[in-house]
Amino acid sequence: MKIPEEEVALLEDYVSDSVDHRGFPAGKSSTGGWRSAWFIIGVEVAERFAYFGIACNLITYLTGPLGQSTAKAAVNVNTWSGTASILPILGAFVADAYLGRYRTIVVASLIYILGLGLLTLSASLIIMGLSKQRNDASAKPSIWVNTLFFCSLYLVAIGQGGHKPCVQAFGADQFDAEDPKEVIARGSFFNWWFLSLSAGISISIIVVAYVQENVNWAFGFGIPCLFMVMALAIFLLGRKIYRYPKGHHEEVNSSNTFARIGRVFVIAFKNRKLRLEHSSLELDQGLLEDGQSEKRKDRLNFLAKAMISREGVEPCSGRDVDDAKALVRLIPIWITYVVSTIPYAQYITFFTKQGVTVDRRILPGVEIPAASLLSFVGVSILISVPLYERVFLPIARKITKKPFGITMLQRIGAGMVLSVFNMMLAALVESKRLKIAREHGLVDKPDVTVPMSIWWFVPQYLLLGMIDLFSMVGTQEFFYDQVPTELRSIGLSLSLSAMGLSSFLSGFLISLIDWATGKDGWFNSNLNRAHVDYFYWLLAAFTAIAFFAFLFISKMYVYRRLDQV
């Protein structure tokens, strides 16, 4: 029986697996798309403004009012940054299994605001305490004020851990994965998302860092708190036009996703001694082209044993096995990405400390805080994203004959190569800074400005923006796209957790090298006697090794969808 044209049009106007704020099927004309995505992008701009208002100058605060050594402060910053980047896994689990993305964002925002408020309070108490002891050069904040500061700092990490993976996944949810036009729009969403949040980061770095160093730290921490309140208000304004994943508006418990995928591994292990029938393999490979099936035959067939029917045990479905395989395939990619992102930890630690030692005048009489150098990352992204969208992708599409221009893995690999060159550049610039310090007899005068312009450091920050555009955005889109639909918050949290783990690895390397080389080694508190350039060469080598491993793994990777191959 032929379906009337009116009914076809009506069916096409709704998005499968999505509902509106009332729980009814989400209409394309009234919900989602760019109209709701811009609300969510606005939220992320405000959130990144708040986060980087704390992160960009944290090492200066730790070595200043808190009186920590450079090495200890770098480890503390890396530990906090790493924790903040790994917590999104927990936030994504809570969202995908229990609360849903919308509710998780609201709860996480409230925790975020509480943490920023307490951080402002602790900074006020520290300022008041130090002002009473201004004649004592060795004065440090009391233990309980220190404790309040670090507790509030980690409360911020918890808040952003719930906020970060859910906001981006919720934004991508606004585009219909079954509509070819909206799929391409979703790819653009990730690019413009990154450009917008980079604008927020750049403004934060310029404004907040200046306030912190030239007004006071309490006011400098209070501004991010105000912006986070604004972020929550903006998010709630768009409630009626959002598309919500269907599972979180019905009685369906998304934790079943974790259970069914976990069950694949359990049943496959129990069936490990059974022989796999050829029909099971065909079922598992049915959605792939012949070339891709051949590619898959020798790998992960162990998990297909979960589909074998056995007395007393219900077999897993082909979909469950495919979802489990998709997660397993991501692990090697994730590991190489973790190693390649260790250099990221340096731009809020050693890059900033190096900037403090040089001539920071950008114009006669105009001196900028060292942390403001981070704004050049945003400038690079603001220039690179439109060029990538309007110039690079059209050319790539003509060459490759593919709608996406280049694959997501090719995009990530390009970012890794740029990261190697960036660490080499950073090492050369630091070598020059040390040479100038020696030539002017400033090796033992750390408080005297090294006569080297801060503009020497700008290229490595501009290159960081390009690395973010290729590697970070590519990784976020890749993990979002390649995980099961119900676990997309988890997918995005995997890319974020890689950044977190790399921060921990960076902190571990710093502690290990500092212990091995002694107080006059690579990380001397007097940077004119240190050798941070050696550390940068080491990171360049690690990143190069990670890239070649990534290259080998990516050649064998099987995409979940044929249009990504």
Curated annotation (Swiss-Prot):
Main location: membrane
Keywords from the UniProt entry: Membrane, Phosphoprotein, Transmembrane, Transmembrane helix, Transport
InterPro entries: MFS_trans_sf, NRT1/PTR, POT_fam, PTR2_symporter_CS
GO cellular component: membrane
Subcellular location(s) of the protein: Membrane
Record's bilayer topology term: Multi-pass membrane protein
Gene designation per UniProt: NPF5.15
Name of one Pfam family that matches: PTR2
Species for this entry: Arabidopsis thaliana (Mouse-ear cress)
Family: Belongs to the major facilitator superfamily. Proton-dependent oligopeptide transporter (POT/PTR) (TC 2.A.17) family.
Protein name as catalogued: Protein NRT1/ PTR FAMILY 5.15
Tissue specificity annotation: Expressed in shoots, roots and leaves.
Phosphothreonine, modified sites: T104
GO molecular function: dipeptide transmembrane transporter activity; tripeptide transmembrane transporter activity
Segments crossing the lipid bilayer: 49-67, 80-100, 110-130, 142-162, 189-209, 217-237, 331-351, 368-388, 409-429, 454-474, 490-510, 534-554
